[in-house]
C-alpha cells in the first residue's frame, strides 16, 4: 500500500487561495491547522512569516506556493530556507505579475548550472 502523498500549501491573496481551494488543495492536519493562509490588508508580516515557518516545519507539506509580492515581505525567511522539500514556488497574483528578477529560488537555480550544462 502506497503512503499518503504530501500537500501543497498556499500563502496568497484571497483570489489566489480561493482558486487553489476550489481546485481541491484545502486540508486540515491532525491538529486542525489548515494548509493555506489568506493574506488580507490587515494581515501582519509576523503572521505571514509565522505561517511560512509553520508550513516549513510540517512533514505533510511538500510544496509551498506564495504570491511573489507577499514573498517580498518575508524575503529573509524564504532566502534562509535551503532544503529542497518543501519546495517554495513564487507565483503571480491577479494584481501583481511575476518578476523573475525577484525570485530568489530561480536565481539560486540559475547559479547551479552553466551554459555548458544546458547543451
UniProtKB/Swiss-Prot annotation:
<dbReference type="GO" id="GO:0000139">
    <property type="term" value="C:Golgi membrane"/>
</dbReference>
<keyword id="KW-0375">Hydrogen ion transport</keyword>
<comment type="function">
    <text>Subunit of the V1 complex of vacuolar(H+)-ATPase (V-ATPase), a multisubunit enzyme composed of a peripheral complex (V1) that hydrolyzes ATP and a membrane integral complex (V0) that translocates protons. V-ATPase is responsible for acidifying and maintaining the pH of intracellular compartments and in some cell types, is targeted to the plasma membrane, where it is responsible for acidifying the extracellular environment.</text>
</comment>
<dbReference type="GO" id="GO:0005765">
    <property type="term" value="C:lysosomal membrane"/>
</dbReference>
<dbReference type="GO" id="GO:0005829">
    <property type="term" value="C:cytosol"/>
</dbReference>
<dbReference type="InterPro" id="IPR008218">
    <property type="entry name" value="ATPase_V1-cplx_f_g_su"/>
</dbReference>
<dbReference type="GO" id="GO:0046961">
    <property type="term" value="F:proton-transporting ATPase activity, rotational mechanism"/>
</dbReference>
<keyword id="KW-0813">Transport</keyword>
<dbReference type="GO" id="GO:0010008">
    <property type="term" value="C:endosome membrane"/>
</dbReference>
<dbReference type="GO" id="GO:0070062">
    <property type="term" value="C:extracellular exosome"/>
</dbReference>
<keyword id="KW-0968">Cytoplasmic vesicle</keyword>
<dbReference type="GO" id="GO:0097401">
    <property type="term" value="P:synaptic vesicle lumen acidification"/>
</dbReference>
<dbReference type="GO" id="GO:0005886">
    <property type="term" value="C:plasma membrane"/>
</dbReference>
<dbReference type="GO" id="GO:0000221">
    <property type="term" value="C:vacuolar proton-transporting V-type ATPase, V1 domain"/>
</dbReference>
<dbReference type="GO" id="GO:0042625">
    <property type="term" value="F:ATPase-coupled ion transmembrane transporter activity"/>
</dbReference>
<dbReference type="Pfam" id="PF01990">
    <property type="entry name" value="ATP-synt_F"/>
</dbReference>
<dbReference type="GO" id="GO:0030665">
    <property type="term" value="C:clathrin-coated vesicle membrane"/>
</dbReference>
<dbReference type="GO" id="GO:0015078">
    <property type="term" value="F:proton transmembrane transporter activity"/>
</dbReference>
<dbReference type="GO" id="GO:0007042">
    <property type="term" value="P:lysosomal lumen acidification"/>
</dbReference>
<keyword id="KW-0770">Synapse</keyword>
<dbReference type="InterPro" id="IPR036906">
    <property type="entry name" value="ATPase_V1_fsu_sf"/>
</dbReference>
<dbReference type="GO" id="GO:0051452">
    <property type="term" value="P:intracellular pH reduction"/>
</dbReference>
<comment type="similarity">
    <text>Belongs to the V-ATPase F subunit family.</text>
</comment>
<dbReference type="GO" id="GO:0016020">
    <property type="term" value="C:membrane"/>
</dbReference>
<dbReference type="GO" id="GO:0048388">
    <property type="term" value="P:endosomal lumen acidification"/>
</dbReference>
<dbReference type="GO" id="GO:0016471">
    <property type="term" value="C:vacuolar proton-transporting V-type ATPase complex"/>
</dbReference>
<keyword id="KW-0406">Ion transport</keyword>
<keyword id="KW-0472">Membrane</keyword>
<protein>
    <recommendedName>
        <fullName>V-type proton ATPase subunit F</fullName>
    </recommendedName>
</protein>
<dbReference type="InterPro" id="IPR005772">
    <property type="entry name" value="ATPase_V1-cplx_fsu_euk"/>
</dbReference>
<dbReference type="GO" id="GO:0033176">
    <property type="term" value="C:proton-transporting V-type ATPase complex"/>
</dbReference>
<comment type="subunit">
    <text>V-ATPase is a heteromultimeric enzyme made up of two complexes: the ATP-hydrolytic V1 complex and the proton translocation V0 complex. The V1 complex consists of three catalytic AB heterodimers that form a heterohexamer, three peripheral stalks each consisting of EG heterodimers, one central rotor including subunits D and F, and the regulatory subunits C and H. The proton translocation complex V0 consists of the proton transport subunit a, a ring of proteolipid subunits c9c'', rotary subunit d, subunits e and f, and the accessory subunits ATP6AP1/Ac45 and ATP6AP2/PRR.</text>
</comment>
<dbReference type="GO" id="GO:0030672">
    <property type="term" value="C:synaptic vesicle membrane"/>
</dbReference>
<dbReference type="GO" id="GO:1902600">
    <property type="term" value="P:proton transmembrane transport"/>
</dbReference>
<dbReference type="GO" id="GO:0007035">
    <property type="term" value="P:vacuolar acidification"/>
</dbReference>
<dbReference type="GO" id="GO:0061795">
    <property type="term" value="P:Golgi lumen acidification"/>
</dbReference>
Amino acid at each position: 500500500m502506497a503512503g499518503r502523498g504530501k500537500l501543497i500549501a498556499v500563502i496568497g491573496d484571497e483570489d489566489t487561495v480561493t482558486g487553489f481551494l476550489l481546485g481541491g488543495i484545502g486540508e486540515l492536519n491532525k491538529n486542525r491547522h489548515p494548509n493555506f493562509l489568506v493574506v488580507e490588508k490587515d494581515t501582519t508580516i509576523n503572521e505571514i512569516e509565522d505561517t511560512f515557518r509553520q508550513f516549513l516545519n510540517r512533514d505533510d507539506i511538500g510544496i509551498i506556493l506564495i504570491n511573489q509580492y507577499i514573498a517580498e515581505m518575508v524575503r529573509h525567511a524564504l532566502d534562509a530556507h535551503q532544503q529542497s522539500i518543501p519546495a517554495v514556488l513564487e507565483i503571480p497574483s491577479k494584481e501583481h505579475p511575476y518578476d523573475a528578477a525577484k525570485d530568489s529560488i530561480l536565481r539560486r537555480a540559475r547559479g547551479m548550472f552553466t551554459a555548458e550544462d544546458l547543451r
